[in-house]
Amino acid sequence: MTGTSNIPTHGKEHKDAPALLPLPAPNTHHTHAAHPGDPSHDRHPSRGKLFIKTHGCQMNEYDSAKMADVLTTTEALELTDNPEEADIILINTCSIREKAQEKVFSQLGRWRALKTNGRDVIIGVGGCVASQEGETIVKRAPYVDLVFGPQTLHRLPDMIRARREQNRPQVDISFPEIEKFDHLPTPRAEGPSAFVSIMEGCSKYCSFCVVPYTRGEEVSRPFEDVLTEIAHLATQGVREINLLGQNVNAYRGAMDPGPSNNTNPAPPPYADLGLLIRAIAQFESIGRIRFTTSHPLEFSDSLVEAYRDVPQLANHLHLPVQSGSDRILSAMKRGYTALEFKSKIRKLRAVRPDISISSDFIIGFPGESDTDFQKTMQLIKDIGFDQSFSFIYSRRPGTPASNLEDHTPDEIKRTRLEHLQKHINAYAADISKRMIGTVQTVLVEGPSKKNPNELTGKTENMRPVNFPGHPRLIGQFIDVHITEALTNSLRGRVHTN
């Protein structure tokens, strides 16, 4: 297997996705608060300003957006990008790496001065560091007022009120499963692409990872609830849906059994990711579907069939492999071999020959030898990965891997990482260059940040494209002729037949 066939092409032919279920009406969403755009919300003047800083993954970005929705709706707060003028300051944290965790306390130290000038500023810490550290955060930084986990962000209004009434810090890092989604305001679109969380947590317990301990085990949102949220977003002009989960392809959403008889058999008790993708594809206005992040163990034949049958499913897959060495994969408790990983990619490319594959790699895992690293490099050559997130192993307290002996010098780890990144960057650059002259379907997201007179969007394989165009194209899928490949983006022009 090689990576020489993964240049995306325009006009893929796939079978039509089968009809599935009646789509939900948008007004069935569970909510306990008015939408910020509703007249009932507009009657309330702003009661202060809210600043949110986000560290980490796309799940955290999604959660931060929901924090903003909750507090701008229920508390009539106004968002600001300046913490010095905020009445409530929240930091949504990541604990996947040690440096990310220390950054949190450095940031909190800088905000401490904002509470010394007589202003009643509330500082809150959410996310995975909050789940991991809990009340230790308040002990280390006693000026922190709120500590809340990813599953309790919907309780922020109550926590803020309790903090003001009781004049003491509030800590809630419990795991109330999927409760938070029933208490969030109506989803609010901010552009033509939107994230939708379909599950929380992870039950794989990889030896290096803190996610099961900070976000809990896997819990999937009910099938109809996910479709209802997407229905709301579709009415607001969203054209692309990004499905989120720590282990998104382990999705098992409960389905409403409904009436059944001999001629109308009951649906299965749950929907997997493949079935969910097919259902989303029934929304006429949704032109592209993505999902992240996946686990190779859960990359099923059902998902391969969705790639075969659903043209709206983007021609790109991010599938973290972490290592090409079976010995290291076993120590990581990943549950698969390099050969099994390649077999899954082979099945996928049988139905999508030009799909681009990106991945994650951990370099310098305890005990990694030169031979182990060379097996990783061979896997990279065999697959032809297009882009990666690659890091030197970071020891996380409380994980099984933290007890493993590590005798590899840091200098060797850095050299290996640079070598790996150099090769993957070369593969990615080659793919970008081979896209010159092709026509790509691009979702126009808005004005280019580098040149406001141009537009920007993304190809199916996640490459930003900048091109001249009229603002009326924003929010539409258009064909773009690629004219130039730069280091981190492409340039093009609107394609006309």
Curated annotation (Swiss-Prot):
Superkingdom as given in the UniProt entry: Bacteria
GO cellular component: cytosol
Alphabetic keyword roster: 4Fe-4S, Cytoplasm, Iron, Iron-sulfur, Metal-binding, S-adenosyl-L-methionine, Transferase, tRNA processing
UniProt enzyme class: transferase
Single GO MF annotation: metal ion binding
Binding site for [4Fe-4S] cluster 2: C202, C206, C209
Domain Radical SAM core residues, every copy: 188-430
Entry note: cofactor: Binds 2 [4Fe-4S] clusters. One cluster is coordinated with 3 cysteines and an exchangeable S-adenosyl-L-methionine.
Domain MTTase N-terminal residues, every copy: 48-165
Subunit structure: Monomer.
NCBIfam families (UniProt xref): miaB-methiolase, MiaB/RimO family radical SAM methylthiotransferase
Family per record: Belongs to the methylthiotransferase family. MiaB subfamily.
Descriptive protein name: tRNA-2-methylthio-N(6)-dimethylallyladenosine synthase
Organism: Xylella fastidiosa (strain Temecula1 / ATCC 700964)
Lineage: Bacteria, Pseudomonadati, Pseudomonadota, Gammaproteobacteria, Lysobacterales
